[in-house]
Design a protein with these regions (language model features):
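Hinge/lid segment of periplasmic solute-binding proteins
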Residues: 110-162, 296-298, 367-370
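Extracytoplasmic "Venus flytrap"/periplasmic binding protein-like
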Residues: 69, 73-138, 174-176, 266-276, ...
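Mature extracytoplasmic/periplasmic domains
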Residues: 285, 315-396
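N-terminal secretory signal peptides
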Residues: 1-11, 22-31
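A structural signal for short loop-to-beta-strand junctions that line the ligand-binding cleft
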Residues: 96, 103-104, 133-171, 306-309, ...
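Extracytoplasmic/periplasmic substrate-recognition and gating elements
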Residues: 68-73, 175, 243, 250-254, ...
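C-terminal capping/gating helix-and-loop segments adjacent to ligand/active sites or protein-protein/ligand interfaces
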Residues: 373-426
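Glycine-centered hinge/linker elements that transmit conformational signals in sensory
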Residues: 192, 230-258
Length: 433
């Protein structure tokens, strides 16, 4: 959920979104992380905590401004920062965690909660809530529950987003398509055909590797990508999904996979290879930055004309279980999710603010971010939002495998049958670990 999801892994440092969701980055603005485990202290009572995240340089600039506000309010707490691109962040974090040297506080996503809880890395912040150092009041749409696993508060959400179909609005206009809430997958297929036939462009960039989209499709049909301890679908289910995708690539309904690979890190949508792309709603800002067209948000297609299977995803902040400064870390997280000035600085960089105070403090005036807010509000009003799918230990590895193997299938390196077999083999190993 940008959260670190499919699109994020494909985006590069100069093309990634500048004001929304989960973005990629290169190494650091400001101070870098200390080499010792946990935070540090000084003789005058000042403590230093380490804070790491994945994100673009624009995100780093915003975060550094919020840290300056925090240090002004809490002059005895200093914050040292470190950030990398998404994949590099998790490689480094895994190494740090294995060596007992992770940052005191760090950006996180739901796919990693059980993994690092099982490794005794994550602090249960519930104790800090009870101590009055962290408030879980005032969150929108039940988002305060998002970081709870097995009764433990392992993460605090900082921004919400949801899956959407991002469309090239002029292309859809030329094709005569007006997606509406409740449209079906058959309607979607017809729309892709019209885009191809009337504009000469592929209808979609290729949805086959987007794990979170397939999860919605499964949820529409009474299943889910994950259960509490494994996969929630069969090889036959995935064969049907990827066979449909393979046909779409061959017929030109989905963008040429070779061309999509060639233009990375730019998206197929902003590169004008396709008329739409399934991703997190806040990636609209990325496409606006990358491309020359006007982009909008369309509803997720449905199986029965009603259920979309959607939920609000979120980036979150988590803490190291053995941090030397749990109180200060909790105060830092509390400040970052509740302070109105933080919202004004961050905007929708990490999604729509999760607390009502921050949501009210930042009301966008530009059309792109206004559309993102309106889209999420429409989901709440339509009553389509459900509880998020569980993410067992190993979910992050399954997500990466799903994307990689789907791309290999689309490129012709694997047959559908081989791709399905390979995914289930890798997932079985990941989820057993």
């Amino acid at each position: 959920m940008q959260q670190g999801g499919n699109a994020e892994r494909q985006a590069g440092r100069r093309t990634i979104l500048k004001a929304a969701g989960a973005s990629l980055a290169v190494a650091g603005l400001g101070a870098t992380a200390t080499a010792c485990g946990g935070g540090t202290g000084s003789g005058d009572g000042t403590v230093t905590i380490r804070y790491s995240w994945w994100g673009a340089e624009d995100r780093a600039e915003r975060i550094n401004k919020t840290i300056a506000l925090f240090e002004k309010k809490y002059p005895k707490i200093k914050v040292k920062t470190d950030f990398q691109p998404y994949t590099d962040f998790w490689k480094k974090f895994n190494t740090q965690a294995s060596g007992g040297n992770p940052p005191d506080v760090f950006q996180n996503a739901i796919g990693f909660l059980r993994k690092y809880d099982a490794k005794n890395v994550l602090l249960d912040l519930g104790g800090q809530v009870q101590a009055g150092n962290l408030s879980m009041d005032g969150f929108r749409a039940g988002l305060e529950k998002f970081g709870e696993i097995d009764g433990k508060l392992l993460g605090v959400p900082v921004g919400s987003n949801s899956m959407a179909l991002v469309i090239d609005k002029p292309v859809y206009t030329r094709a005569g398509i007006k997606p509406e809430q409740g449209w079906t997958w058959d309607d979607f297929d017809e729309a892709m055909t019209r885009v191809r036939d009337r504009t000469g462009r592929a209808g979609d960039s290729g949805m086959y590797g987007v794990m979170y989209l397939y999860d919605l499709y499964l949820r529409q049909n009474g299943k889910a990508f994950f259960t509490e301890d494994g996969l929630g679908f069969t090889e036959a289910d995935l064969t049907t999904w990827w066979t449909r995708a393979e046909r779409g690539v061959r017929s030109g309904l989905y963008a040429d996979a070779k061309k999509v690979a060639q233009i990375k890190p730019k998206s197929a949508l902003s590169a004008e290879l396709a008329g739409s792309e399934f991703t997190w709603d806040n990636f609209t800002v990325r496409y606006t930055s990358e491309g020359k067209s006007e982009y909008g948000l369309a509803p997720i297609p449905t199986t029965d004309g009603k259920r979309t299977g959607q939920y609000l995803g979120s980036l979150m902040l988590s803490a190291y279980k053995r941090t030397e400064h749990p109180k200060e870390v909790a105060q830092f997280i509390d400040f970052m999710v509740h302070d109105p000035e933080v919202a004004k600085i961050m905007g929708y960089d990490r999604g729509v603010p999760t607390t009502q105070a921050q949501y009210d403090a930042y009301r966008p005036t530009d059309p792109v971010n206004k559309a993102i807010a309106a889209y999420e509000e429409s989901l709440v009003e339509a009553g389509v939002l459900e509880q998020i799918t569980p993410h067992p230990n190993g979910a992050d590895i399954c997500e990466a495998a799903f994307l990689r193997i789907a791309e290999e299938m689309a490129l012709g390196s694997r047959s559908v049958e081989e791709a399905v077999e390979q995914f289930f083999t890798e997932s079985k190993t990941a989820l057993a670990g």
